Amino acid sequence: MTPTIFLVILCLGVASAVIVPEAQLDAELQEQKDKEVLIKAVWSKFMKTNKLHSSENDQETEGSNIEMSASGQLTDEELMKIMTTVLHPMFEEEENKPQPVVDDPEFEDYTESGDGFFVPNQPQ
């Protein structure tokens, strides 16, 4: 077998093994992207309505004020990073605070003075 024939067979084998994109996976990916766009649109509409409602209530003397945090859009990693930066300094402050010194009574050895309590027939 000559090297050219071997090379042709190898090229044909590689060409036949090329991955063909599946239409079903592409459709699922497009559907997922459409859902994300819809979720973002609904979220932005909700936030606009929320801000409008809050601004209307700010003008009145009585009423409820609805506030929504943006943590609903954060991933788990982003939320953990924020919580770590907020809570970690709080716990460090508690650890670094000096503990109050409590006046402990001095240890008294009753065995030497004979003032101890006698317990007869104590099981061992």
From Swiss-Prot:
Residues 103-112 have a biased composition (Acidic residues). Keywords: Secreted, Signal. Disulfide bonds: none annotated. Residues 1-18 form the signal peptide. GO terms for biological process: JNK cascade. Its main location: secreted. One of its GO terms (cellular component) is extracellular region. Residues 51-74, 91-124 are annotated as: Disordered. Residues 62-74 have a biased composition (Polar residues). It comes from the Eukaryota. It is found in: Secreted, Extracellular space. It may be a growth factor/hormone, perhaps involved in interaction between the maternal and fetal systems in maintenance of pregnancy. This is Trophoblast-specific protein alpha. The gene is Tpbpa.
